[in-house]
Amino acid sequence: HTAGGVVGGDRLSLNITLQPQAHVLITTAAAGKIYRSNSLQARQVTHLQVAEGACLEWLPQETIVFNQATYRQDLRVDLAPGATWVGWEITRLGRSARGERFLQGEWRSHTEVWQQETPLW
C-alpha cells in the first residue's frame, strides 16, 4: 500500500511471514487509492504466511478504485496447523461521499486461503 496512490503500470508485491506463536496486527495509514489508468493495469500481490500457533489480524483500510482505473489485486494466505488469520479486503468503487462513481474501468480481486495445501476459501 502506498498512501499516495497507485497508477496504471504500478506493480506492488508484499510478502509477510509470521514465526510460530507470533501475534501481529497489520493495518494501513490511509485508504488505498487506485487512480485512473493510462491504459496499463496496476497490480498488487500479497502473500501472507502464518506459522503454527501464530495469529495475524490483516485489517487494512478500504481500497478506493477511481473511475477508469484498471486494477487487479491478489491475496493468498497460507496457514500452518493451529494458525489463525482474521482479515478483510474492503473495496469502494468510486468516492460515493463526493458523488463520484466507478462507471468505466476494470477491478479484479482474488483471495485464496490455504491450510496444509488444502484450499479453505
Language model segments and positions:
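Conserved beta-strand/loop scaffold segments within soluble protein domains that form the structured core
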Residues: 1-121
